[in-house]
């Protein structure tokens, strides 16, 4: 619950690489260049979400940058936060942000930091602060939640470049980090675009548009309850029960699995079926006796699994022969290979139209449940076996292409996330302004030097009787 190091020790450790400074710079305590105001303990009985009174910033609002809490009680002086004010959460992760919403009151466990801009550049301060907060957080012990004291903030030794250099660094960081954020935002949109692409591929696959060479092929209309789809006229129509191996009928699995048995038989549950696949890495295990009672629901290679309780419509395919059973919330479909290609059935069940049908066909009991009777009667389009194989080939080819792009995007995102840290570290080592310093020696020397700035700050403090920057508290 307490901070375990001094600011000097943090700087020596420099665990996040953001506490370095250029050898021409100095350091100064935060309370020498900023005023810290602790939040007030406003009565929670006066809080409301009806917009009665004035907005109030609670610690949960720091990262959001806005609040839905209002305070209707008496307002003491000195606890207002205005747009562009810097606030810090004093519990948990010690987050800092620039407040961009309407004026609001400062509640307890949030502090406001007002930079004395004749001594320190506000934007430079904002870029520097998170690295120190992160280091403080890493060196703060806790039983439940970590707490940050304003005394720790006051004593934090910040980098002190010349004022002109602070301004240049802040401007460079504003530009570079905005570019990083823009790049990151564009990259983060791509997985959603790829998701829509995959859905479009599935929709095209199950309506013949992926394989028909003549794009003006003749279609016929099929009605699925409230939905209508067009499929090629030369495709057959059937129901799910007609394409299931009669020796292994549609079924659900183990109703009461009992305890997790170390040397038992593995069991596939809803949580093990995601993104079209069955994850076999973390299966729970049931006793061999219970498994024997449910021999009917054992799985084999190429079985299709559908979740039918809770999260309706997750589809998975068993890729290998394994000694595994399924849970009550999972249905097993064993395709008749002479009629349907297992992966084509997987594609059909995963398609947007069937996913909608599965969800809307489920009934709300204690939890959403899809009855096996309804599932048996689900419509299935039937191209020729040859065309099914070709559909599967093309879908897998396009999905592999999308997967490759997604992997590249994830790698790029990882590099972009590291880029912010790298840029900040370079900035505070003075590397972003090396050329600027060489071109502007007069702005970093003499009366414009970091040493002169430090002496000026000390002199002003001495003239005011050694009084430190105010720290309001109640």
UniProtKB/Swiss-Prot annotation:
GO terms for molecular function: DNA binding. InterPro entries: Restrct_endonuc_typeI_TRD, Restrct_endonuc_typeI_TRD_sf, Type-I_RE_S_subunit. GO terms for biological process: DNA restriction-modification system. The type I restriction/modification system is composed of three polypeptides R, M and S. The restriction enzyme has stoichiometry R(2)M(2)S(1) while the methyltransferase is M(2)S(1). It comes from Escherichia coli. Type I restriction and modification enzymes are complex, multifunctional systems which require ATP, S-adenosyl methionine and Mg(2+) as cofactors and, in addition to their endonucleolytic and methylase activities, are potent DNA-dependent ATPases. Contains two DNA recognition domains, each specifying recognition of one of the two defined components of the target sequence. The specificity (S) subunit of a type I restriction enzyme; this subunit dictates DNA sequence specificity. In the presence of the R subunit the complex can also act as an endonuclease, binding to the same target sequence but cutting the DNA some distance from this site. Whether the DNA is cut or modified depends on the methylation state of the target sequence. When the target site is unmodified, the DNA is cut. This is Type I restriction enzyme EcoBI specificity subunit. The keyword DNA-binding applies. Belongs to the type-I restriction system S methylase family. Keywords: DNA-binding, Restriction system.
């Amino acid at each position: 619950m307490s901070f375990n190091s001094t600011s000097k020790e943090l700087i020596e450790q420099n665990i996040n690489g953001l506490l370095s400074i250029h050898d021409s710079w100095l350091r100064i305590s935060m309370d020498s260049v900023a005023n810290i105001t602790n939040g007030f303990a406003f009565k929670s009985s006066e809080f409301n979400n009806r917009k009665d009174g004035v907005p109030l910033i609670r610690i949960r609002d720091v990262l959001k940058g806005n609040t839905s809490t209002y305070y209707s009680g008496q307002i003491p002086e000195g606890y207002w936060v205005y747009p562009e004010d810097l606030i810090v959460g004093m519990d948990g992760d010690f987050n800092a942000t620039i407040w961009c919403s309407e004026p609001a009151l400062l509640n307890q466990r949030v502090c406001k930091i007002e930079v004395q801009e004749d001594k320190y550049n506000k934007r430079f301060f904002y870029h520097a602060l998170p690295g120190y907060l992160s280091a403080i957080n890493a060196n703060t012990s806790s039983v439940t939640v970590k707490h940050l004291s304003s005394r720790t903030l006051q004593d934090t030794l910040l980098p002190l470049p010349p004022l002109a250099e602070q301004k240049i660094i802040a401007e460079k960081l504003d530009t570079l980090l905005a570019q990083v954020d823009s790049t990151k935002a564009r990259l983060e949109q791509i997985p959603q675009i790829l998701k829509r692409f995959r859905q479009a591929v599935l929709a095209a696959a199950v309506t013949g548009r992926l394989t028909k060479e003549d794009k003006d092929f003749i279609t016929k209309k099929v009605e699925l309850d409230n939905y209508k789809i067009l499929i090629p006229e030369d495709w057959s129509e059937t129901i799910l029960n007609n394409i299931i191996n009669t020796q292994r009928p549609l079924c659900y699995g183990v109703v009461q699995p009992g305890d997790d048995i170390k040397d038992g038989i593995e069991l596939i549950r809803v949580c093990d079926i995601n993104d079209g696949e069955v994850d076999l890495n973390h299966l729970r295990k049931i006793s061999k006796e219970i498994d024997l009672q449910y021999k009917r629901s054992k799985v084999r290679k190429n079985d299709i699994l559908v979740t039918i309780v809770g999260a309706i419509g997750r589809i998975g395919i068993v890729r290998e022969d394994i000694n595994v059973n399924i849970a009550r919330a999972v249905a097993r479909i064993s395709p008749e290979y002479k009629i349907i290609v297992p992966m084509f059935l997987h594609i059909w069940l995963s398609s947007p139209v069937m996913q909608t049908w599965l969800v809307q066909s489920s009934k709300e009991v204690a939890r959403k449940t899809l009855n096996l009777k309804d599932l048996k009667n689900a419509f299935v389009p039937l191209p020729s076996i040859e065309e099914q194989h070709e559909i599967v080939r093309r879908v897998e080819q396009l999905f592999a292409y999308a997967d490759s792009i997604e992997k590249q995007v994830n790698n790029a995102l990882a590099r972009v996330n590291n880029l912010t840290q790298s840029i900040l570290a370079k900035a505070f080592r003075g590397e972003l302004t090396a050329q600027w310093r060489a071109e502007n020696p007069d702005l970093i020397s003499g009366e414009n030097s970091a040493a002169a700035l430090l002496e000026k700050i000390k002199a002003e403090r001495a003239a005011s009787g050694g009084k430190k920057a105010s720290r309001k508290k109640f």
